[in-house]
Amino acid sequence: MAVQQNKVSKSRRNNRRAHDSLVAANPNECTNCGELKRPHHICAACGHYDDKEVVALTEEIDLEDDAA
């Protein structure tokens, strides 16, 4: 296990950690459907990326009809 040579003060420790925070990415608007999506990702609403359909989305299945 590593052992420190000298004590690291709270100020020096916190200054080192100042740049460790995570920043949320700004969502972009889908050019096909207008929904918000993550940058450089396929739109979850319509399955398009770069104005091309990449994923064909299936229709939702109604479970209420099957349960009866």
Curated annotation (Swiss-Prot):
Pfam families: Ribosomal_L32p. GO terms for cellular component: large ribosomal subunit. GO terms for biological process: translation. One of its GO terms (molecular function) is structural constituent of ribosome. Keywords: Ribonucleoprotein, Ribosomal protein. The lineage of its organism: Bacteria, Pseudomonadati, Pseudomonadota, Alphaproteobacteria, Rhodobacterales. InterPro entries: Ribosomal_bL32 (IPR002677), Ribosomal_bL32_bact (IPR044957), Ribosomal_zn-bd (IPR011332). The gene is rpmF. PANTHER family: 50S RIBOSOMAL PROTEIN L32, LARGE RIBOSOMAL SUBUNIT PROTEIN BL32. Residues 1-21 are annotated as: Disordered. It comes from Roseobacter denitrificans (strain ATCC 33942 / OCh 114) (Erythrobacter sp. (strain OCh 114)). This is Large ribosomal subunit protein bL32. Belongs to the bacterial ribosomal protein bL32 family.
